[in-house]
Design a protein with these regions (language model features):
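Extended interfacial segments that mediate partner engagement and assembly in macromolecular machines
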Residues: 12, 16-17
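N-terminal active-site wall of soluble small-molecule enzyme domains
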Residues: 41-48, 182-188
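Core AdoMet radical
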Residues: 2-10, 21-40, 49-114, 120-124, ...
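Charged helix-capping and loop-helix junction motifs
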Residues: 10, 41-45, 138-142, 178
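Short, small-residue-enriched loops and turns at beta-alpha junctions
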Residues: 33-38, 128-133, 175
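Conserved C-terminal portion of the radical SAM core fold
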Residues: 29, 79, 105-169, 181-195
Length: 195
C-alpha cells in the first residue's frame, strides 16, 4: 500500500466520516518520519482541525524537539506514542542503519522531551520480536519508572506489539512470543506498575 499525506481538506473529510461511525472522542494521528512534509507546522494544523471533532488528540510521529511538542500542546495535543522498538543500542543500528530513525539516543530521549514540554500522556513500548523480550521489557520498565519520578504529573501507557512472521519470505522476527508469555508479561507489568 503506497503511503500518502492527506491534505487538510481530506483530513477533515476523514474526521467527519469517523464521527459518523459513532461517538468517538479519541483520535490518533500517525505520520512517517518525514519532517519536511509532516513536521510541526503540518501537525499543528492537523490538530486544529481534529479538535473540532475529538476531545482527546494523540500523535504517533517521529521524535520531535521539546519545543515542537510544547507548540503542539497549544494546538490541543493530549498525548504522544513513541516506540523505542528495542533498547539494545548495538542491534538498533542493524534495524535502522541510516536516516533520522538511526539516532538511538534521539529516540530513547524522546519521552524526556515530551515530559519537559508538559505532554499529558506518553505511550511507549518495544517491538516484541526484535530482541529478547525479557531484556527489552526490563529496560522499558526502568525507563518508565524514571519518567514517572521525573515527570510525575504525566500519565503513561505501555504497549507490547508482537511481531509475527511475514508471508512470502518477508521479515522474520528474531523471537516469537507465545500467548502464555504475553500473559506473563502483562501480569508482571501490572505488579510493577499498578496504573
Amino acid at each position: 500500500m503506497p503511503r500518502t499525506i492527506l491534505t487538510f481538506e481530506e483530513m477533515e473529510d476523514e474526521f467527519k466520516a469517523i464521527k459518523r461511525l459513532g461517538p468517538f472522542e479519541n483520535i490518533l494521528l500517525v505520520t512517517g518520519e518525514n519532517p519536511a512534509k509532516a513536521g510541526v507546522p503540518y501537525l499543528a494544523q492537523a490538530l486544529d482541525i481534529a479538535k473540532k471533532y475529538f476531545a482527546n488528540l494523540k500523535i504517533e510521529v517521529m521524535p520531535l524537539k521539546s519545543e515542537g511538542y510544547k507548540e503542539l500542546t497549544h494546538h490541543g495535543l493530549n498525548g504522544v506514542i513513541c516506540f523505542q522498538e528495542t533498547y539494545n543500542s548495538e542491534r538498533y543500528k542493524i534495524y535502522h542503519p541510516r536516516g533520522m530513525k538511526s539516532k538511538f539516543d534521539w529516540r530513547v530521549d524522546a519521552p524526556d522531551r515530551m515530559g519537559q514540554a508538559g505532554v499529558h500522556s506518553i505511550g511507549m513500548g518495544v517491538l516484541i520480536g526484535l530482541e529478547d523480550w525479557r531484556t527489552d521489557v526490563t529496560f522499558l520498565a526502568r525507563h518508565l519508572r524514571y519518567l514517572q519520578r521525573t515527570y510525575w504529573r504525566t500519565k503513561y501507557s505501555v504497549n507490547f506489539p508482537r511481531m509475527r512472521p511475514a508471508e512470502n519470505d518477508g521479515f522474520q522476527p528474531n523471537v516469537l512470543m507465545t500467548d502464555k508469555e504475553l500473559a506473563q508479561l502483562t501480569f508482571a507489568m501490572r505488579i510493577f506498575d499498578h496504573d
